[in-house]
Amino acid sequence: MSTALKADTPLYLGIDGGGSKCRAVIVSADQQILGEGLSGPANPLRGMKVATDSILTATQQALSSAGLAFNDMSRLIAGAGLAGVNMPQYYRLFSAWQHPFKTLHLTSDLHIACMGAHQGLDGAVIIVGTGSCGLAEVNGQLIEVGGHGFPYGDNGSGAWFGMQLLHKVLLSLDQLAPPTQMTTLLLQELAASNSIEVVSHFMQATPTTYAKYAPLVFIAAEAGDATALQLVRQGAEFISAIADRLLSIAPPRLSFIGGLAHKLLPYLPEHIQQQVTPALQPPELGAVWFARQRSQLPSSVMSL
């Protein structure tokens, strides 16, 4: 057995729990990545059981990938950055969860994204995935923007683009708005032929469902569709406003992460594009940084 896998060696678990996916990584005390896992949404707004099941599934995959047993879950010093726990009621729910880990240190997905992007140093990060939000920290000054959840916020996010796509397609099908290539793309994707079939598909839609169809907006925009281009530019304006707010405190680095980040970047103003630098590490490794920091504090300390 390697030193990293000995029973008395600390093991760290990093969890990045977003609105669509949950990523887990197990890291040894000497910072070797031992195993990784991937599962479904871990946002408690979707329900505690959904979120905790996703965390446990991703963790079990990471254990298996690392050659560890299920019982080794109790050895893990876990750091979890979850979408939704910026809301006090969900933070309390997760804090009371009877988890199977050695310890669980809880924070937001935005916090671990920033820690990973800048390896724990000052900087700013914007998430453009299922949701949208941003955070900057400079010399102890903290700015957090967004993170209010869909449909109340998350402008410029995957869920927002998917919802706007649906609105525009339905208007076009009713001949209340100009034709758009997005109609053809969505009908093909859903194997639908009319507005009733489209609406039926979305009747129980979650933010993840809407976000799934966001790429269709960009496909149409890249083909020159005027309606899609208008939507992309509107979404880019929302994200640009977040960036300008964060840049107001002059963070030394700005990184974008999330499934739509690379699609939106070309539509952002030049002064923002020039500030963007690649994230140094992914959010799940930011969660490991967080766990390592917090495990040096009293075990009762858990903080956003």
For each feature predicted by the language model, list its residue ranges.
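Active-site nucleophile and cofactor-binding loops and adjacent substrate-binding regions
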Residues: 103-112, 127-128, 276-285
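Short, conserved acidic/polar surface loops in the N-terminal third of protein domains
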Residues: 89-93, 115-119, 136-139, 267
